Amino acid sequence: MAAVVRRMGPVWWGLTPALDLQMHLHPPPPPEIYCSCSDDLPELNILLVGGGDGRHILKTICQASRWPHRKLKFFIIESDLELLARHMLFLSLALEHPEQMGLQEKSELFLELFGNSLIRNKTASYLQEKSELFIRYVTDPDYQQSNVPLLNLSSIKFKERDKLEDIFKFWRNADPKLFPIDKYWDEKNRQNLGRRYDSRKGAYDWDLSMKLHDRGAGVINSREYNYWREKGVAFMNREGVYDIPNKTLASQMVVPQSSGKVLARGYWGDITASPYIAFGIETEEESLLQTANGVHVKSAQDIAQHNMISLFHELAYGKIYSVPASGQAESELAKTDSDYKTNEEQTVGLITLNNVEIHFLPRFNNFFNLLYFSCSMVHFLKPEYKFIAASKATLVLELTKFMVDLQTEKLQDYVTIVAKLAQEAGFTPTETIDWKTDYIAKFERAHDS
């Protein structure tokens, strides 16, 4: 497909914490560098190449009220259509009106679909019902625009729409045997660990303490990390049985077999870094980062849950979330414990975002104020990208700090490589890159490029 390239597995969750991209513009651009909208509201055009999970989009949208009023336009290029499908799912979930779904329920549902190999029955029902809606979105553009006008699918070709429809039909199918992810997870674990598989708990502990903890993700505790490494279940925020495969983690890839190369569906994503990096290791609520005797009091799950509640609160109400006093519970958090309403039962519309647009697969020149490349897609950063970057555009590159499988010297080498790629593409660093502490690197379009 156009602007979609195959690599070794999709990035279901990113390798760096979610960013409010407006915070990383360097320097904060004056209004005159923005493109002008018909309503004279300044635009900020953001290109995301290989963002994967939409975490940067979500955080930037949710925290937009903290910044001068402007129209945000996101342009998305992904390696796999399944990632675009997940973008649609998480965006739709984020926009569920608080009268329809409380913040607690929404946050738990998001994290469950985001980072769990296995989900609860009512979560699976929600996914099936949403899939029915998404099928109509990709097959009926007028219906999609009338319901979710901020999502622009006009650049997606008919062939790609057909493939998206097939993905959503697969999600809609309730048969758990179609995607035995517990089997796929174990097979990938065995392949990754090799002879260490029989002593895998020690391998898990080593990766956590000597890699993730040493690189700044100390809030992830061994209990949650080991359980995720073993089962693929990262978030269990409520009592329930997690036994239904999360089909949003399924993708197809060409694999070699005795009969030749075949297209196989399976789980081809991460099994070492964890979904905790995206939302669970940083927070504005400092009390969640407290330690006792050198051990974090709260877990990465606790932090992720708080962060999602905070983001969804800010999206719905336009103000920063405050933690309730001890012993108190805000009514907006716990809307209902019953099953989520089906599409037919919904009487409340989605949260309206008038000044946000999300486009898939763009092609523009001298246009983008901010460009983001994930570490899995940075090799596509070519000199030609300087022609689509606006004057003084910011380039943000994801680094490999939390990539467990890389040794120290590889982390250093990667920084050198991406700095050279950025320079060749016409960008200069805005600050010194420290491979030990930084998980992103920032550059600015050179004046003479």
Swiss-Prot record:
GO biological process, alphabetically ordered: axonemal dynein complex assembly; motile cilium assembly
Claim: Cytoplasm is one of the keywords in the record: yes
Subcellular location: Cytoplasm; Dynein axonemal particle
One cellular component (GO) term of this entry: dynein axonemal particle
Alphabetical list of InterPro entries matching this protein: DNAAF3, DNAAF3_C, DUF4470
Chain's role: Required for the assembly of axonemal inner and outer dynein arms. Involved in preassembly of dyneins into complexes before their transport into cilia.
Family statement: Belongs to the DNAAF3 family.
This protein's name: Dynein axonemal assembly factor 3
Organism encoding this protein: Xenopus tropicalis (Western clawed frog)
